Amino acid sequence: MAKEISSELLNTILTRVGGPGNIASCGNCMTRLRLGVHDSSLVDPNIKTLEGVKSVILTSDQVQVVFGPGKAHRAAKAMSELLGEAPVQDAAEIAAQNKRQLKAKQTSGVQQFLAKFATIFTPLIPGFIAAGLLLGIATLIATVMHVPADAQGTLPDALNFMKVFSKGLFTFLVILVGYNAAQAFGGTGVNGAIIAALFLLGYNPAATTGYYAGFHDFFGLPIDPRGNIIGVLIAAWACARIEGMVRRFMPDDLDMLLTSLITLLITATLAYLIIMPLGGWLFEGMSWLFMHLNSNPFGCAVLAGLFLIAVVFGVHQGFIPVYLALMDSQGFNSLFPILSMAGAGQVGAALALYWRSQPHSALRSQVRGAIIPGLLGVGEPLIYGVTLPRMKPFVTACLGGAAGGLFIGLIAWWGLPMGLNSAFGPSGLVALPLMTSAQGILPAMAVYAGGILVAWVCGFIFTTLFGCRNVNLD
């Protein structure tokens, strides 16, 4: 295990979050150890001062400890082992020490709500990336080698095999989301999965594709299973709340037999009567809003320019339902490459800091250690190790990202909208083969590469001109 995530460091973190008895869950995303906590008043915000910890994001029920790419998974695994061995400690003394500090650190209700999306979607991200990469590589090979869609032979069969994973993922994605969402909101995962499946079924007996539900109306009322992910999230939340209320009044002897049964009946009724139409309206409204922002160059610039701030506050996972809505409405995720420009702006800013700093300075060492992950789309090392501590370069990095977003928005406005072939995927240079458009994969790759180049150059120029004044370059 790397020095930065030694057992001593993890034991210190465990103590400062209130001890094992305060830990509700332990997980990770690509760069962060995510610890769910029972009582946030027991958490010491000075965890971020520990050597090896890049930053800490606090919400009402979760502590996100930023380690960087490749380390978060090892940290989560080691922390889980510690939690399995450690006795529960009395954290009253820690609470008394931290209570006054944390009064100024309360997170907003919006941030708490968006933090739920990390719990729901983070476990799905590796699958999104894998399926998207396979689809992108297969599409690129088919385009370059001019393989017709109806071709026969070993190569077409291999390409179809590579594409089948994304088809399977997006066909049954709502069931995975329903399961995770019900758990995130405090319910039973399988109940959420069953309710989500209602959105997947077909209600037209004449349809030749899909899975017919066996009825076409709900006691005479029409069924319109629109809304997809938006509707499923609402239904999973309702399912978890209803389950909690039912369980409160259910005798223990009947809990196993009747709680889920009653929960499903009530939630399904609400889904058919209220949630499906409501989810459909929200889905259409959200799609309309972001499609118009995407087609507006200045809207694209604003989105790209603000995304790094969302990452800092740990709420960037809240965009994932929007990605899924855009996949349904457009066939590709046009928002993701725009937001990816934020990371490219950071790369440009970091290169400017490297150029302006002394040959043997600590800053150059920091940039060298963080620039490769930044080029590959992992921005936290640059954020927390290079730009954010110096503030001005962070602002100029945001401006560089905004310039890249403006470029992509202008190209879309001129008639070439493009996007990611998956709801979620890697950013940076790794995402190049995942780009697609109505005009094909190669034009989309060219637009994305152009946006990255613009963000690099503008981030470099803005930081050189405005981001290095009165900034510690040692």
Curated annotation (Swiss-Prot):
<feature type="topological domain" description="Cytoplasmic">
    <location>
        <begin position="179"/>
        <end position="180"/>
    </location>
</feature>
<keyword id="KW-0808">Transferase</keyword>
<keyword id="KW-0472">Membrane</keyword>
<feature type="transmembrane region" description="Helical">
    <location>
        <begin position="335"/>
        <end position="355"/>
    </location>
</feature>
<feature type="domain" description="PTS EIIC type-1">
    <location>
        <begin position="115"/>
        <end position="474"/>
    </location>
</feature>
<keyword id="KW-0813">Transport</keyword>
<keyword id="KW-0997">Cell inner membrane</keyword>
<feature type="topological domain" description="Cytoplasmic">
    <location>
        <begin position="462"/>
        <end position="474"/>
    </location>
</feature>
<dbReference type="GO" id="GO:0008982">
    <property type="term" value="F:protein-N(PI)-phosphohistidine-sugar phosphotransferase activity"/>
</dbReference>
<feature type="domain" description="PTS EIIB type-1">
    <location>
        <begin position="1"/>
        <end position="89"/>
    </location>
</feature>
<dbReference type="GO" id="GO:0009401">
    <property type="term" value="P:phosphoenolpyruvate-dependent sugar phosphotransferase system"/>
</dbReference>
<feature type="transmembrane region" description="Helical">
    <location>
        <begin position="441"/>
        <end position="461"/>
    </location>
</feature>
<dbReference type="InterPro" id="IPR018113">
    <property type="entry name" value="PTrfase_EIIB_Cys"/>
</dbReference>
<feature type="topological domain" description="Periplasmic">
    <location>
        <begin position="145"/>
        <end position="157"/>
    </location>
</feature>
<feature type="active site" description="Phosphocysteine intermediate; for EIIB activity">
    <location>
        <position position="29"/>
    </location>
</feature>
<feature type="transmembrane region" description="Helical">
    <location>
        <begin position="158"/>
        <end position="178"/>
    </location>
</feature>
<keyword id="KW-0418">Kinase</keyword>
<keyword id="KW-0598">Phosphotransferase system</keyword>
<dbReference type="InterPro" id="IPR036878">
    <property type="entry name" value="Glu_permease_IIB"/>
</dbReference>
<dbReference type="InterPro" id="IPR001996">
    <property type="entry name" value="PTS_IIB_1"/>
</dbReference>
<feature type="topological domain" description="Cytoplasmic">
    <location>
        <begin position="390"/>
        <end position="393"/>
    </location>
</feature>
<dbReference type="GO" id="GO:0005886">
    <property type="term" value="C:plasma membrane"/>
</dbReference>
<dbReference type="GO" id="GO:0016301">
    <property type="term" value="F:kinase activity"/>
</dbReference>
<keyword id="KW-1003">Cell membrane</keyword>
<feature type="topological domain" description="Periplasmic">
    <location>
        <begin position="356"/>
        <end position="368"/>
    </location>
</feature>
<protein>
    <recommendedName>
        <fullName>PTS system N-acetylmuramic acid-specific EIIBC component</fullName>
        <ecNumber>2.7.1.192</ecNumber>
    </recommendedName>
</protein>
<keyword id="KW-1133">Transmembrane helix</keyword>
<dbReference type="Pfam" id="PF02378">
    <property type="entry name" value="PTS_EIIC"/>
</dbReference>
<feature type="transmembrane region" description="Helical">
    <location>
        <begin position="218"/>
        <end position="238"/>
    </location>
</feature>
<feature type="transmembrane region" description="Helical">
    <location>
        <begin position="124"/>
        <end position="144"/>
    </location>
</feature>
<feature type="topological domain" description="Periplasmic">
    <location>
        <begin position="282"/>
        <end position="301"/>
    </location>
</feature>
<keyword id="KW-0762">Sugar transport</keyword>
<feature type="topological domain" description="Cytoplasmic">
    <location>
        <begin position="1"/>
        <end position="123"/>
    </location>
</feature>
<keyword id="KW-0812">Transmembrane</keyword>
<feature type="transmembrane region" description="Helical">
    <location>
        <begin position="302"/>
        <end position="322"/>
    </location>
</feature>
<feature type="transmembrane region" description="Helical">
    <location>
        <begin position="369"/>
        <end position="389"/>
    </location>
</feature>
<feature type="topological domain" description="Cytoplasmic">
    <location>
        <begin position="239"/>
        <end position="260"/>
    </location>
</feature>
<feature type="transmembrane region" description="Helical">
    <location>
        <begin position="181"/>
        <end position="201"/>
    </location>
</feature>
<dbReference type="InterPro" id="IPR003352">
    <property type="entry name" value="PTS_EIIC"/>
</dbReference>
<feature type="topological domain" description="Periplasmic">
    <location>
        <begin position="202"/>
        <end position="217"/>
    </location>
</feature>
<dbReference type="InterPro" id="IPR050558">
    <property type="entry name" value="PTS_Sugar-Specific_Components"/>
</dbReference>
<dbReference type="InterPro" id="IPR013013">
    <property type="entry name" value="PTS_EIIC_1"/>
</dbReference>
